[in-house]
From Swiss-Prot:
Catalyzes the transfer of endogenously produced octanoic acid from octanoyl-acyl-carrier-protein onto the lipoyl domains of lipoate-dependent enzymes. Lipoyl-ACP can also act as a substrate although octanoyl-ACP is likely to be the physiological substrate. It comes from Pasteurella multocida (strain Pm70). The active site is at residue 175. GO terms for cellular component: cytoplasm. InterPro entries: aa-tRNA-synth_II/BPL/LPL (IPR045864), BPL_LPL_catalytic (IPR004143), Octanoyltransferase (IPR000544), Octanoyltransferase_CS (IPR020605). It is an enzyme of class 2 (transferase). This is Octanoyltransferase. Pfam families: LplA-B_cat. In the reaction, the free carboxyl group of octanoic acid is attached via an amide linkage to the epsilon-amino group of a specific lysine residue of lipoyl domains of lipoate-dependent enzymes. NCBIfam families: lipB (TIGR00214), PRK14342.1 (NF010922). Belongs to the LipB family. It catalyses: octanoyl-[ACP] + L-lysyl-[protein] = N(6)-octanoyl-L-lysyl-[protein] + holo-[ACP] + H(+). Its EC number is 2.3.1.181.
Amino acid sequence: MSNLSPLLVRQLGIQDYQTVWQQMQTFTDSRDVDTQDEIWLVQHPAVFTQGQAGKAEHLLQQTTIPVVQSDRGGQITYHGLGQQVMYVLVDIKRQKALGNEFNVRQLVSALEQAVVNTLADYGIHAYPKADAPGVYIDEKKICSLGLRIRKGCSFHGLALNINMDLSPFHFINPCGYAGLEMCQLADFIDPQQASCEKVAPKLVAHFAQLLGYNATNF
C-alpha cells in the first residue's frame, strides 16, 4: 500500500465523548478527496456507549454513568480515564481508487493487529477472535472495537484498556457478551509503566506500519 498518504495524528487529551463524536461526524461529512487521513487519540470521562446493534438488556444496572446511543458498530461498552481510545478517520474509497487492496475488513484486522503487536512489545501474547471483534488475553478482553463507514470513509475506532478502573464493566454485558471478563495492560506489567502516554506512540506506529502509511505526525 505504498500509495497511501501521510497519516496525521492528533492528541486530543481528555474530552467528552459526545463532543468528539460530533467532531468525527463533521470531519467525515466535510472531507473531500484531498483530505488527509487522521488518527485521533483521546481519553473519555466515564461513559457507556451503545453501538447500533446494542440492546437495552445488556445494561445490567442503572448507575450515575451516562449512557450514549452511538452510531458505531457493535454493542455496549465502557470508556473511562486510563483507557486509550484511537479513532481512525480513513478514506477507504480513495485508497481503492489509488489501486490499493483496501476494505473495511482489512482496516479492522489492521486495528486488531496493531494492538496485538503493541502488547507484544511488552512481552504479552494477545490475539483477535474471528467471531468477536477486539483483542483478548487468556479469554479476557483488553481492547474493544467498533467502526462506522460513511461516504466510503471510516470513523470511530478502538478502545484499549491501559490502567483504569474496570469496575464499571460489571454493570454491562461488554460488547453484548454475558460474563465476559475485561483486563488491562496494568494487570500484566508494572502499573507505573502502563500509561496512555507510553502506549499511544507504539500503537500508532504499528497501525501505520501495517497499512503502509509513509509518515505520521505525532
